[in-house]
Amino acid sequence: MMSAMKFIKDLLDAECTYRLPDDVMWRFIGLMTREEVRKGGTVIDEGRVNPDIYIVADGIFSYNYLNGTDERCHAFALPGAMMWSAYSYYAREPVVYTYQACCDSVVYHCRVRDFDDLIKDSHEFAQWMLCYTQCQLYYFEKKNSLINGDAPERFKSMLRNRPEIFE
């Protein structure tokens, strides 16, 4: 069990540019419970309030949402990724995405109450979470820039495809 926890620690250490002191990281890991998720199983479900935190230890998860009647994939989570819903964590509103296992997977689950207590008790953990969240937001924005192009590319595309807008 200790080697599995060390593996989680190493994954989390590699996910963020801000290095959390070992004692605080071990405290965070100590709050988690290991859960196995079968292929197709979910840890966070659209339409439900779930503010808890999940760390992928093994496997791959997709973040899916419904667009009308079509299910669309927004992103993927690999080992070391932290999965949480901003809707549920921040606003206590129902989740927009379903976080679904693409294969048999393992996550470590931290209840929001324990997570929030650690943020309140540890300035270093709060800094680490801020950095971690900023990193996630950076990569979501980076993904969108690659899919949609940057502002000059989008402007040129609009000129080409919708010149009437500029008349």
Where are these regions (language model features)?
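Hydrophobic (often cysteine-bearing) scaffold residues that line and stabilize catalytic clefts
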Residues: 4, 52, 151
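Generic structural signal for secondary-structure transition and capping sites
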Residues: 17, 33, 37, 82, ...
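Hydrophobic residues at beta-strand termini and immediately following loops
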Residues: 35-37, 77, 110
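Cyclic nucleotide-binding regulatory domains
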Residues: 16, 41-102
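Polybasic "coupling" helices that flank or enter modular domains
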Residues: 100-103, 108-167
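Cyclic nucleotide-binding regulatory module and flanking cytosolic helices
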Residues: 1-33
